[in-house]
């Protein structure tokens, strides 16, 4: 039988409400840049999607007032940010912490699905292909973002580790040795 999903931290409501004040679309540019870097560093992600490499995926953090739409492509991957979820091939919805935890291997996807903390709609085969591609790549979003920060990387990793400890949200891979109890500088 599947394990019980742990209690998942939710994004603070006041911060989520504040996100409603500005436009969502400009968030797409930095997210697209991060996604393109991930694809460049992990080109097998696109290949692993197989027949779903042209699918559009809605990633819907249910505790935030926006939806991310992933358009995978070997060189032109794009993430668009919308207030309302547009029509896509597959929609994966759940609290932001659960979605990040799936990427980092901190949560069991089956347990989240059967506990209804994670909802899959549309083409479930496409969603499964995306999940398998991400699992195989062993992505570390915290490390990828830190790498983008150039000379600030040494200072950023301890900050990411501290934020992870304080919030309980998986911001990097669970097995990342850089998340030792380093002091925040």
Features from the language model and the residues they span:
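Feature captures hydrophobic
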Residues: 1-185
């Amino acid at each position: 039988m599947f394990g019980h999903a742990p209690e998942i931290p939710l994004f603070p409501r006041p911060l989520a409400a504040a996100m409603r004040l500005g436009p969502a679309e400009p968030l797409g540019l930095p997210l697209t840049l991060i996604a393109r870097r991930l694809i460049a560093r992990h080109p097998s992600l696109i290949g692993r999607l197989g027949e779903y490499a042209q699918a559009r995926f809605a990633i819907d953090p249910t505790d935030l007032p926006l939806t991310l739409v992933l358009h995978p492509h070997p060189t032109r991957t794009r993430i668009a940010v919308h207030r309302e979820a547009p029509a896509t091939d597959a929609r994966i919805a759940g609290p932001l912490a659960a979605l990040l935890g799936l990427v980092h291997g901190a949560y069991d996807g089956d347990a989240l699905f059967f506990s209804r903390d994670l909802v899959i709609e549309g083409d479930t085969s496409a969603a499964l292909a995306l999940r398998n591609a991400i699992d195989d790549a062993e992505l570390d979003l915290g490390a990828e973002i830190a790498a983008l920060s150039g000379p600030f990387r040494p200072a950023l990793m301890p900050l990411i580790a501290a934020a992870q400890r304080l919030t309980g949200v998986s911001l990097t891979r669970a097995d990342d040795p850089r998340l030792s109890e380093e002091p925040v500088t």
